[in-house]
Amino acid sequence: MPRYRLLVEYDGTPFNGWQRQDKGLSVQGILEKAVEKLCGVPCTLHAAGRTDAGVHATGQVAHVDLPRDYPADTVRDALNYHMKPKPVAVVAAELVDEDFHARFSAVGRAYLYRIVNRRAPLALDQHRAWWVPVALDAEAMAEGARRLLGHHDFSTFRASECQAKSPMKTLDVLDVTRVGEEIRIVAEARSFLHHQVRNMVGTLKLVGEGKWSPDDMAKVLEARDRTKGGPTAPAAGLVLTGVSYSASGGKSGPTG
């Protein structure tokens, strides 16, 4: 069966996450229904990352095996037609080797977290950013973020329901920059623990508020205890921006 790789973009606001569920709307469920309308038989999609409820994506990657060959552009256009008016789009589709796997072939994932730091509430971006009205020191947050880089036990930033076999991860990038009233946090790693990015952001906010020092980030990391970390940042500010593959597998998204 021919295998297709899909580059998928979605607004996570109305969804209960990527993963198909018995009840509730899911991105996977919407895509699989569209695939079935295209080819007439049920097909299972596999994604690079199973994003949580409310988390968005501009660079999600999925693959699906179809019962016959279709032009890649036909796959893209047909799926987009059948998904209307849901806020999901297949940006690109391509035929790939049968050994490609959206999840297991990935060598890197990139996320962007947006904080809007101003007194006025958000009228347009309330579902696409975390509104923080208290002044934040982005430079202190950036310094604290550097304490987390490298290979560590990230238990402090791991959700209690995380199913990963090990809390050991290598964090390659955790950059914090301010652009006007917006603070952008970019995180890149081969893979992340459940809620890892949002838990790191929630903890960095404490540094930005001056409640913690940048050195406190190293201390809570060493504690390996979720109760020692900061709160989980809201899902709305998080975007999966890209997934990286080996040279033969290519990459997705602007930061993939």
Swiss-Prot record:
Keywords associated with the record: Isomerase, tRNA processing
Binding site for substrate: Y111
GO biological process: tRNA pseudouridine synthesis
Superkingdom of the organism of origin: Bacteria
Molecular-function annotations in GO: RNA binding; tRNA pseudouridine(38-40) synthase activity
Signal peptide: none
Catalytic activity, reaction form: uridine(38/39/40) in tRNA = pseudouridine(38/39/40) in tRNA
Active site location: D52 (nucleophile)
EC numbers for this chain: 5.4.99.12
UniProt entry tagged with the keyword tRNA processing: yes
Record-stated family: Belongs to the tRNA pseudouridine synthase TruA family.
Protein's job: Formation of pseudouridine at positions 38, 39 and 40 in the anticodon stem and loop of transfer RNAs.
Subunit structure: Homodimer.
Name the UniProt record assigns to this protein: tRNA pseudouridine synthase A
